[in-house]
A protein has these predicted regions:
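Transmembrane helical elements of multi-pass membrane transporters/channels
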Residues: 12-31, 138, 149, 172, ...
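Helix-terminus/linker motif at the lipid-water interface of multi-pass membrane proteins
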Residues: 22, 26-44, 119-126, 182-193, ...
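N-terminal transmembrane alpha-helices
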Residues: 2-33, 37-38, 54-66, 101-108, ...
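Small-residue-rich hydrophobic transmembrane alpha-helices
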Residues: 43-109, 146-165, 264, 275-341, ...
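Interfacial/gating helices of multi-pass transporter permease domains
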Residues: 35-54, 127-131, 195-197, 237-245, ...
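Alpha-helical transmembrane segments and their lipid-water interface positions
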Residues: 24, 28-31, 35, 57-64, ...
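Short alpha-helical transmembrane segments in multi-pass integral membrane proteins
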Residues: 1-17, 71-144, 190-247, 303-369, ...
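Short runs within selected transmembrane alpha-helices of multi-pass transporters and secretion channels
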Residues: 64, 68, 139-158, 165-176, ...
Length: 452
C-alpha cells in the first residue's frame, strides 16, 4: 500500500539535506577552479592539505551521525516521557559537542606542531610541502568552526530542523566565494594572498556558518532546548549509552575513510590512464549520490523517531518502503549516469585510450550505484537509525578489507582485467552489503533498545 504521508515526510527531510550536499560539492569545485588558476603547485598543495582535513571531516560526520541515532530516538520518546527524553536530548548534544572539541584540538595541535610532517605523508615535493604548511596555519582555527557547525547541523536535522541549516549553507557558500575571490587574487582592496587567501576564505566562511548554526542551537531552537548553561551539565549517566551506540559509527566511518584512501592508492598505481579516467568520472559519482545521501539521513531520522515513539511494527514497514526506495533511486541514478557519460567524457581533451577507460568506468559506476543506493539507505539510514551500529561497524569493514580491496588488487595487478571489472571488484563490498542488509532487515534483530 502506498503511504503518501511517509513519502512526503521523507521528501521533506531528504530534499534540503541533498541540496546542502550539492552546495558542498559546488564549494569544493569553486575552490579547485580558483586555486587552479594560480598554478599546479598551488592546486596540489591545497588538495593534499585538504586530504588531511577531510579525515577530520569524516570523523566529525561519524560523531554527528552517531549522536543523531540517540537524538532522533529521544525526540520520538518525548510524547511518552517528555521530561526524561528532553534531558537525555540535551545530554547527548552536550557529549557530542565535547567530543567534537576534543577531536578538533587533536587535529589542530597536529597542524600546529608538525604541519611539514603531515604534508610529507602525501608528497616529497618541497614547494608543495611549503605551500601546504602555509594553508595549515589558517586551518588550525578552522577545525573548531568546521566541527561544531557540522555536528550541530546533524543534531538539528535529527529533530526535523532541515531547512535552517540549508539556508546557512547557502549563505556560507556566498561568503566563501566572495572571501576566496578577494583574498586569493587581491580584489576589493584586499592583499593578494594566493594559497593563504584560500585558507583564510574558508576560515571566514566556516566562522560565519558556525556562528549562525551554533547561535541558533544555543539561543533560538526550542526542539532540543539546548542552552549555554547545558555545556557544563553532568552527563556521566549517559556516557555509556553514547559510547555503545555512537562510537561504533565513529570507528566505522573512520576505518572506512582509511579504506577509501587505500582504494585510491590502488587506483593511483594502475597507471596514468586509469587515474585520469577516474578523475573524469568523480564529479558524476558525487552528483549521482547527492539525493541518495539525503534519503540515507532521512532514513536514520524517521526510523529513530518511529522507534522512539515505541512503534516497532511501523518501523519494520517503513524499512521495507526505504528498501524499495533505495532500489528505485539506484535505478534512476544508473540511467542518469549512462545519459550524461557521453557528453561529460567528450568535454575533456584526453586521449582515445583514456576516453575508452572512462566510458568503461561510467558503465561500472552505473551498475554499482544500484547496489550502493540500496545498501546505503539501509545501512547508513534504517539499520543505523535502529541502533544496530556495532553490527554495521563489523559488516562495513569486513566487506571492505576482506572482499573488495583484495579483489581489486587481484583484478588490477595479477589478472590485469579491464577497467570495468577492476572497478566492480574494488566496489564489490557494495554488492555484498546489499544482500547482507536485506537478510539483516528481515531478521528483525537490527532494532535495539536505547536507555534514557
Amino acid at each position: 500500500m502506498f503511504d503518501s504521508k511517509f513519502y512526503k515526510r521523507v521528501a521533506f527531510l531528504a530534499t534540503p539535506i541533498a541540496l546542502q550536499s550539492l552546495i558542498t560539492i559546488g564549494v569544493n569545485m569553486l575552490d579547485t577552479i580558483m586555486v587552479g588558476n594560480l598554478g599546479e603547485t598551488e592546486l596540489s598543495a591545497v588538495s593534499l592539505a585538504n586530504q588531511f582535513i577531510n579525515i577530520y571531516h569524516i570523523f566529525c560526520m561519524g560523531i554527528g551521525m552517531g549522536a543523531s541515532v540517540l537524538i532522533a530516538r529521544y525526540w520520538g520518546m518525548k510524547k511518552e516521557e517528555p521530561e526524561r527524553a528532553a534531558l537525555a536530548l540535551r545530554k547527548t548534544v552536550c557529549i557530542m559537542i565535547r567530543v567534537t572539541v576534543a577531536l578538533a584540538l587533536i587535529f589542530a595541535l597536529g597542524m600546529l606542531l608538525c604541519p611539514g610532517s603531515i604534508m610529507r605523508m602525501y608528497t616529497t615535493e618541497q614547494d608543495i610541502i611549503r605551500l601546504g604548511v602555509v594553508y595549515f596555519r589558517y586551518s588550525i582555527v578552522t577545525c573548531f568552526f568546521l566541527g561544531l557547525s557540522l555536528v550541530c547541523t546533524i543534531g538539528l536535522r535529527s529533530v526535523g530542523q532541515v531547512h535552517m541549516p540549508l539556508f546557512v549553507s547557502i549563505g556560507a557558500f556566498i561568503v566563501n566565494l566572495c572571501a576566496n575571490y578577494a583574498f586569493i587574487f587581491g580584489k576589493f582592496g584586499m592583499p593578494r594572498m594566493e594559497v593563504a587567501g584560500a585558507a583564510l576564505g574558508t576560515l571566514i566562511a566556516r566562522l560565519f556558518e558556525a556562528s549562525v548554526i551554533c547561535g541558533y542551537l544555543l539561543f533560538a531552537d526550542k526542539r532540543i532546548g539546548f542552552r549555554c548553561r547545558d555545556l557544563l551539565m553532568k552527563t556521566s549517566d549517559l556516557v555509556g549509552e553514547y559510547v555503545r551506540i555512537s562510537i561504533p559509527v565513529l570507528i566505522s566511518d573512520g576505518i572506512l575513510a582509511i579504506g577509501g584512501n587505500t582504494v585510491a592508492m590502488v587506483i593511483g598505481r594502475l597507471g596514468v590512464t586509469f587515474v585520469a579516467a577516474n578523475a573524469i568520472t568523480s564529479v558524476t559519482q558525487q552528483m549521482s549520490t547527492v539525493l541518495i545521501q539525503g534519503v540515507c539521513q532521512a532514513g536514520a531520522i524517521v526510523t529513530g523517531q518511529t522507534l522512539g515513539e515505541g512503534d516497532r511494527e511501523k518501523a519494520q514497514k517503513q524499512a521495507g518502503s526505504f528498501l524499495r526506495l533505495g532500489i528505485g533511486l539506484g535505478l534512476l541514478s544508473a540511467v542518469f549516469i549512462m545519459a550524461v557519460s557521453g557528453p561529460i567524457i567528450s568535454s575533456y581533451n584526453v586521449s582515445e585510450e583514456t576516453a575508452e577507460v572512462a566510458a568503461q568506468l561510467m558503465k561500472a559506476i552505473s551498475l554499482i550505484i544500484v547496489f550502493q543506493a540500496t545498501n546505503s539507505i539501509m545501512t547508513k539510514g534504517v539499520l543505523r537509525g535502529g541502533g544496530d551500529t556495532k553490527m554495521l561497524m563489523l559488516a562495513d569493514n569486513i566487506f571492505l578489507w576482506v572482499l573488495s580491496i583484495p579483489l581489486g588488487l587481484l583484478a588490477g595487478f595479477v589478472l590485469h582485467w579491464s577497467a570495468f571489472w577492476i572497478y566492480v571488484c574494488l566496489k564489490s563490498d557494495q554488492i555484498a552489503k546489499t544482500f547482507w542488509c536485506i537478510i539483516r532487515l528481515r531478521g528483525g534483530k537490527w532494532i535495539k533498545k536505547i536507555r534514557v
